[in-house]
């Protein structure tokens, strides 16, 4: 299972009380919903709890879904929060996942003044803005106000793991502490890749399981799409894409909603179509929102924040309702991924990924960050291998050169407007082979 701190936290200990509140209010909750026909996708074959629940029910095409009609003319976050409450959302726990892949260094070229999207300055960066807006909107629905917060895609996790923002995987107390931890840890990180959302989704499933089946919202903030190599066949998926799709399907067995917020320049075409490529799920548990498109509008800042919050959360009440109707709320599946978070990175000479997964040592608190300089130089073979691969996707070989002399793979290079290495404007692209 996950870290012991998760089980000992007030969130885990209060699962019974919170679940009783949700169920006891379900009758009044239902009255807030407008009814309309809908098509619910068939259950994933491995979703045994869902399958057994539906065994005596009508076929998916004949089921009815109760949608809340949430308008889109709100002027403040408070109005959006009130609308969510009126629509029936009673209880929600937030989990935050932050993309710290290397592409964050150049995907803010147009939308963030050519700065890294993780740049910490006097004004909030896109990640800080998204955390603040969603945190403020959902805080009234979170009884214990504890927020698990994780990073993925750095030099210790790549596309295989997540790291916690706190020692021993303790949770942040409110979104203000999430922002504080973010400001402290992000400047020390070695951004890397590739990008996969599977590890953070699996960690969220583990948290839901440990809580006894409380409803959670996983907020993933990312600067780019799941890594896709140019070698991937048309109509096929890269390993990272397939793992992410499988994780989203499996997550529909849990009372868990996934909101993916795209920050930076994109492109986001694949993520907009991602939902259509996901096979049958117990319920539609995935929502993508383009943060940059909304926040670049020429309207009042408060209106922009309200529009973003609404776009990100407007499906939450209906998804919460689905977990009630499917009997997912307050239940343990008995077969969660048992995803354990790594401790905050220190980038010691030995990668944390090579240390025992169950280790929760807090000794790193007394060790200074090495600012990217290892006391033991990496092997020449490793360096040479790294230099052969595209610095953007870290998967494909370099086969496209720019006017500045730097290289990427052709798949990534076609979408770039500035060089990811020197940030010069790209005016010439040369296919090497």
From Swiss-Prot:
Stretches assigned to the VWFA domain: 93-313
Biased composition (Low complexity): 22-39
GO cellular component, one term: plasma membrane
Region annotated Disordered, chain positions: 1-61, 340-383
Annotated membrane topology: Lipid-anchor
CDD domains found in the cross-reference section: vWA_copine_like
GO MF annotation list: transferase activity; zinc ion binding
InterPro entries: Copine_C, E3_ligase/Copine_domain, VWF_A, vWFA_dom_sf, Znf_RING, Znf_RING/FYVE/PHD
Protein name listed in UniProt: E3 ubiquitin-protein ligase RGLG5
Source organism of the structure: Arabidopsis thaliana (Mouse-ear cress)
């Amino acid at each position: 299972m996950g870290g012991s701190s998760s089980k000992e936290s007030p969130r885990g200990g209060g699962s019974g009380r919170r679940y009783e509140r949700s169920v006891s209010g379900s009758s009044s909750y239902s009255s807030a919903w407008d009814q309309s026909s809908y098509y619910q996708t068939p259950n994933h074959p491995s979703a045994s709890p869902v399958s057994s629940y539906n065994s005596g029910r009508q076929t998916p095409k004949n089921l009815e879904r109760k949608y809340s009609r949430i308008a889109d003319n709100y002027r403040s976050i408070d109005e959006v929060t009130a609308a969510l409450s009126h629509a029936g959302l009673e209880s929600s726990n937030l989990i935050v996942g932050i993309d710290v892949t290397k592409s964050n260094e150049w995907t803010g070229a147009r939308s963030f003044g050519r700065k890294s999207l993780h740049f910490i300055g006097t004004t909030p960066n896109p990640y800080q803005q998204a955390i603040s807006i969603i945190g403020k909107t959902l805080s009234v629905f979170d009884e214990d106000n504890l927020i698990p917060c994780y990073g993925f895609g750095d030099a210790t996790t790549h596309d295989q793991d997540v790291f916690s923002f706190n020692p021993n995987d303790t949770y942040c107390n409110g979104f203000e502490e999430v922002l504080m931890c973010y400001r402290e840890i992000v400047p020390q990180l070695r951004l890397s890749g590739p990008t996969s959302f599977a590890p953070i989704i699996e960690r969220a499933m583990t948290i839901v399981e440990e809580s006894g089946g409380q409803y959670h919202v996983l907020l993933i903030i990312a600067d780019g799409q799941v890594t896709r190599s140019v070698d991937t066949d048309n109509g096929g998926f890269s390993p990272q894409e397939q793992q992410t799709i499988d994780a989203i399907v499996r997550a529909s067995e849990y009372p868990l909603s996934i909101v993916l917020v795209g920050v930076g320049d994109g492109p986001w075409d694949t993520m907009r179509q991602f939902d259509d490529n996901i096979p049958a799920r117990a319920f539609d548990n995935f929502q993508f929102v383009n943060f940059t498109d909304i926040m670049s509008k020429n309207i009042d800042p408060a209106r922009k924040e309200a529009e973003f919050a609404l776009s990100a959360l407007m499906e939450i009440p209906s998804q919460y309702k689905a977990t009630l109707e499917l009997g997912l709320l307050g239940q343990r599946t008995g077969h969660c991924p048992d995803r354990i978070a790594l401790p905050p990175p220190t980038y010691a000479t030995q990668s944390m990924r090579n240390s025992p997964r169950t280790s929760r040592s807090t000794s790193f608190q007394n060790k200074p960050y090495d600012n990217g300089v290892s006391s033991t130089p990496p092997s020449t073979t490793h360096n040479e291998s790294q230099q052969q691969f595209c610095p953007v996707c870290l998967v494909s070989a370099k086969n496209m050169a720019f006017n500045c002399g730097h290289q990427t793979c052709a798949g990534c290079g076609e979408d770039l407007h500035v060089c990811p290495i020197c940030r010069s404007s790209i005016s010439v692209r040369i296919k090497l082979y």
